[in-house]
Amino acid sequence: INKWSEKVEKGKIDTPVDGLVINYDDTEYASTGTVTGHHATRAGLAFKWQDEVAVTLLDHIEWSCAASVITPVAIFDPVFLEGTTVTRASLCNISEMDRLGIGEDKHTKLKIIKANKIIPKCVGVVSAQGHYTIPKVCPVCQSKAKILVGGDGKTKTLHCINTTCPAKNLRRLARFVSRQGMNIDGLSIKKLVILINKGYITGYSSIYELYQYEKQLY
């Protein structure tokens, strides 16, 4: 374990790895153990490496609407993590922003990781400047936005209350462009959210009119 941990820490492994699994070198003995819902035997142990942490400066907070939920996203100075450059991370909801104690000014210092070596995540605030402001309107349709409290009585999320907001078409649009639908390459849910929030996609037909925004997209 120490040997492989040292290799990972010193960057001596060419292929990105997120953990280490140790198995018994005895299949007969391994078969005598119990099983789990995910594994055929308990013949091994899995270890996860400690997440690499980067400190960076917040540039601004972007609010993105998808299926009526308006999510805060931290946009920050580029940092190199786990083999890629990262510039943004979801802040989940208002409650998470409060827990982190995030500010909104450019001098706010953030701690960023890649959860499971994939998803950028803000895990802490080194120092905060200013205080974030919650938008009063939806960034997509400009209708009134409302803070709702979840069933746990604690989690606060921001929602667009316009029943005809284009962002509420996300699931239908995702099905439309999927392999089972029109099989349109390059339009993932993540990209659909961006294009909807920019006002480039408002319905099915607008997907075929994206050429109008070619200069903005490339």
Regions found by a protein language model. Name each.
Residues 1-218:
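RNA/tRNA-interacting regions in translation and RNA-turnover enzymes
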